[in-house]
């Protein structure tokens, strides 16, 4: 059966999976969603014997129905290979009473690798399928991790260029170095004088600018997105929740059909939305627990039914979640409204004009699958410290947000289901924050010195991603103001 996609803001018009991947964002500013979420084509018991690559094919072929078996298997083989430092791709670590799904074993040691190692291949395959002659320009805003993972994925991929914008003082030193040292003739990195929301809004504005689209087309270019608004990012993320369940079955940690909970540190809502899709496919997930840092706009939304970004933006030690406009939430809003494109459009217009919106009581009742919590900066540091002291396991700041929220949820709800926590980045990526949580004496020390200390205390091997930036030369030093983003893109592409 052919699965088509439609915009959250227009129920009428449909496109194929490859067209949705190419476009990134729908013409009306909405996000592409499948007309229906497919069911898993195999039993849960059959999953447990499969490798990561086999589960990826089993899940993704249901969503990407216009890809041939050969095309999809080729994309998967190119993505999930020796770039990952473990054959399992996303191993589970049992620590205390939870299972940490380590999504940081890829090229840039963050969970974004899981989707961004395959997106370039899905995109170039989609371009061939749709006879696209233009060069594809990937335009991305990053709060730290997406940028590097996208750069690594697209570096020297034929027929593509990639331009990444990041907030000048809004990412960690390691994250910045990972980006500005990126090799590849088709890569560009730009620091903006502003925050992540400015970067994301600027990128979105360029996507929606018809005049710019025309100018680029005349020069032989067209935009696509590597941000989590692209369905080609979301579908590969569904895979690892299916895989986690399969691993628990294989390791006899759960019985077949036993329900589990999932906790996800959440910013842009893509990662937890993928878990929601896995649940809808038939994976027995009871609660989806949304973990926020002090930018707790999502926590407040789940508590009150009102989404309100009119608040102070807090810079925390978990920068990938320092987000007030959670763009993937729109896909959930659309679903809980009964797929009412008009209602979704009205709410998103309110968000744009007023900075807030409130959902109906009926819609709020459809959020029963979700629970939410948030962690303060002190709680994050204490969680890293306590779990290290008790078990020797070292986690990064984003994972600690989730661990703290899980602990509070478990105490409040008395829900003792087996729980998978999405561990979204390597502690090496945030060595400064992690080491000062373990012992305050490390506060303010040089990041690279702390990386060595972290290696000693954790007893883990230094990831390649860190070794690479130790001595790499800086290749990108462009900066611009928020209102110069469009001109900067034109300059990079040589468009007048």
Stretches found by the model and what they are:
Residues 1-496:
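PLP-dependent amino-acid enzyme catalytic core
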